[in-house]
Amino acid sequence: AENTISNTFNFQIVTYIDLRQNNSIESIITNIINIISNDNNEARDFAVLASSTKLLRNIDILYRQRTNEQTEITFISNETLERLKQIHQVTDEKAANWKFNRDFEALERTRKQLFTTDKRCLKISTIQSFKGWESPSVIVILENDIVLHNTTFRPMSPQTIYTAITRARENMYIINIGNDTYHNFFY
């Protein structure tokens, strides 16, 4: 279900998309691609923001596969993560060691430092890492708080939502993939 919500931030477009019943990664990507193509802007004018790097990694790789376009990310890519796991022989059965963690953190830090909004491609970032940046159009993905509680990431606090919303200069799109807390607020 798609809904245009009241606009107190003076955005040109504010759209809420409820994917709580169909929150597959394919459905999320299809909606992101449709938003970009229907907006008459280019992918470079968009940033996709969420709380979880795991979700964003999946969005990044599938978006690149479906569109054959590059992305600019604030975290290491799925491919880099898999290579790092191979180098350190990390598997589902064999946990990460301190060398893996050291290299992972160094690569993540470098990605954040190299991130820029000047590149001519879609930007994908955690909400926290996008603080201080802006984009003409922002797509915020509201994740399920229960899923987030089982990770190292904080649930979507009102401050986090505010930070995400205020990153957009012109257009705001919200894709809810399971967050009941904010559904009534945005719908």
What does each of the following model-derived ranges do?
Residues 1-30, 39-49, 122:
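Inter-lobe coupling/hinge region of RecA-like P-loop helicase motors
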Residues 25-33, 155-159:
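Well-ordered, non-membrane alpha-helical segments in soluble/globular domains
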Residues 37-187:
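Core RecA-like ATPase module of SF1/SF2 helicases and allied nucleic-acid translocases
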